[in-house]
């Protein structure tokens, strides 16, 4: 099972991916985690990524695509994977399609969690309040202003992926505002 989760920050992608990882025994592939692992393991592409990051620049699509390609080849991805945070742009999606085709693999579904942005901001504020009340540490980007910037970036760069995958017939939409169990049940129906 090969999946992509789409949706803005705070939509519940990580929560749903964790459930599917446990249920189906497939890894959740986070771009950030893959990048850090490639750098730590000093792979060829990891060395190139490190040089770019050390120079204070953004890692190119070419390098990110290569890191994803290498990760998909890992033994734990034999039964499938869930991509989280990749692709972020239509050019990355096109590269992923080409990459999977070359490996004789296909995406089973692209699941978009549709959410109300104002409700997302409230959800984030509640999460911060609960974390603080429990004595936990709050992420630096978990404040309303930073969160709104992340939503704006999502709208500009990542939201066009919905149209791309809708054109290919692979996009499935789920109401991400429902409770976690309901969202999980809807995703399970799509995957059945």
Curated annotation (Swiss-Prot):
Span list, region LID: 126-142
Binding-site residues for ATP, renumbered to this chain: 10-15, 127, 178
Cell location: Cytoplasm
GO annotation, biological process: AMP salvage
Annotated stretches, region: NMP: 30-59
One Gene Ontology MF term: adenylate kinase activity
Reaction equations catalysed: AMP + ATP = 2 ADP
Species classification: Bacteria, Pseudomonadati, Pseudomonadota, Alphaproteobacteria, Hyphomicrobiales
The protein's assembly and partners: Monomer.
UniProt-recorded name of the protein: Adenylate kinase
Enzyme class: transferase
NCBIfam families tied to this protein: adk (TIGR01351), PRK00279.1-3 (NF001381), PRK14527.1 (NF011100), PRK14528.1 (NF011101), PRK14531.1 (NF011104), PRK14532.1 (NF011105)
Record field: transmembrane: none
Pfam families (UniProt xref): ADK
Record flagged with keyword Repeat: no
């Amino acid at each position: 099972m090969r999946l992509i989760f789409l949706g803005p920050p705070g939509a519940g992608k990580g929560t749903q991916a964790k459930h599917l990882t446990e249920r189906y025994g497939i890894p959740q592939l986070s771009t950030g985690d893959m990048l850090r692992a490639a750098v730590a393991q000093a792979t060829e592409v990891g060395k190139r990524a490190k040089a770019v990051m050390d120079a204070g620049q953004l890692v190119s699509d070419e390098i990110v695509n290569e890191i994803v390609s290498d990760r998909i080849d890992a033994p734990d991805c034999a039964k499938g994977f869930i991509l989280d945070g990749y692709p972020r742009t239509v050019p990355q999606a096109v590269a992923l399609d080409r990459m999977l085709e070359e490996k004789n693999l296909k995406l089973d579904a692209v699941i978009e969690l549709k959410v109300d942005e104002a409700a997302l901001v409230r959800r984030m504020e509640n999460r911060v309040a609960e974390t603080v009340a429990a004595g936990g540490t709050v992420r630096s980007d978990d404040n309303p202003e930073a969160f709104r910037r992340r939503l704006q970036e999502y709208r500009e760069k990542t939201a066009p992926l919905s149209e791309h995958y809708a054109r290919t017939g692979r996009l499935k939409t789920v109401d991400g505002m429902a409770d976690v169990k309901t969202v999980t049940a809807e995703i399970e129906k799509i995957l059945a």
